[in-house]
């Protein structure tokens, strides 16, 4: 029952990624025609089948790789609507780099045995992991060096509602990024407006302790950790010598378009979100309470209680649609998202959060930035908008974050050795 439920739930339209689904359909034909028979065959038949299947899969990824290059060309020449990939997948977003998908496929095939499988076709996760590997390969070998890696918090760096403890496996790879002169930015929905940054210090204390104590980082590298809280509302910089976060005045990093937002429009967005949650609380008799913050409003379960998944989805979609059709929101950007156990409407989004960091750190470009997150569905997910600002990798849990960043560091250091 659980497995069937999860499969049916994952097929909901708003939870799908059309590009990944499209690639899966391309891979279905070689799986059906070349993945091998189930009965006994002549000696060597199975090996020949694997070789042929791998070749066909690789050809498809090579062709998709060329389609992405074609889209990059058209986007750079203001003729994006003529890109073949955009015609085939109308919802496709922006690419910042080429993606070596064929090479990434061979790498992931060794790990996931995609070509050897006869009963399970290439899956959503197979394609997702190939895209992730291709992206970090491209960043490590690009003409412009990687300068900034940003992370979501919950489910990306630590378990939902958790912290980075001193023994967290995420710490060594984050230190590895800093050691390679890459800024680390945590762009989180957690919105703590207190200027001392102490609450972020509690959530990240294991990482902060490791940065302060390590002798493998320079003093400058130790200060290359930043936190953007509330999606795009509060910026803090770590001061290693004092083991604390320093609040950065918004005048130093707020983007020009955000400066035009009026407090009246911001209040209107939060009021509408609160009304949606209040209505759901009453109508569905939810065991929850509503929390109003400076730049966000959310509905969270009472201690020891749980809001069902369908109820969370109903609220996030209701909030999104209500806000989209309301003239009262003015030109304020907002983010309605399902946090896994709660639902929030925040002022701003991760597009603004990542771009604000890029501007603050010296106009870092999207091709020099990677965002790592777990929520990339088109609706109800707060990492989705980061695709407008930077390259991205889509992970499912903190363990995958460790793996992909370790992979990225390996590629960076290998590239440096080859060019030395």
UniProtKB/Swiss-Prot annotation:
Please, one GO biological process term? nicotinamide riboside biosynthetic process
The UniProt note on how this protein's activity is regulated states: Allosterically activated by ATP. ATP binding is a prerequisite to magnesium and substrate binding. ATP binds to 2 of the subunits in the homotetramer inducing a closure of these 2 subunits and the release of the C-terminal loop, thereby activating the enzyme.
Q: Quaternary arrangement and interactors, per the entry?
A: Homotetramer.
Give the positions the UniProt entry annotates as the active site: 152 (nucleophile), 154 (proton donor)
Role noted for this protein: IMP-specific 5'-nucleotidase involved in IMP (inositol monophosphate) degradation.
User: Which keywords, in A-to-Z order, does the entry hold?
Assistant: ATP-binding, Hydrolase, Magnesium, Metal-binding, Nucleotide metabolism, Nucleotide-binding
The EC designation for this entry is 3.1.3.99
Q: What is this protein called?
A: IMP-specific 5'-nucleotidase 1
Binding, IMP: 152, 154, 160, 188, 342, 350
GO molecular function (one): magnesium ion binding
Protein family (similarity comment): Belongs to the ISN1 family.
Q: Which reaction does it catalyse?
A: IMP + H2O = inosine + phosphate
Organism of origin = Yarrowia lipolytica (strain CLIB 122 / E 150)
Which superkingdom?
A: Eukaryota
**Pfam families assigned:** ISN1
Residues in coiled coil:
none
Q: Respond yes or no to whether keyword Lipid biosynthesis is given for this record.
A: no
Q: Which cofactor is essential here?
A: Mg(2+)
Q: Where does Mg(2+) bind?
A: 152, 154, 374
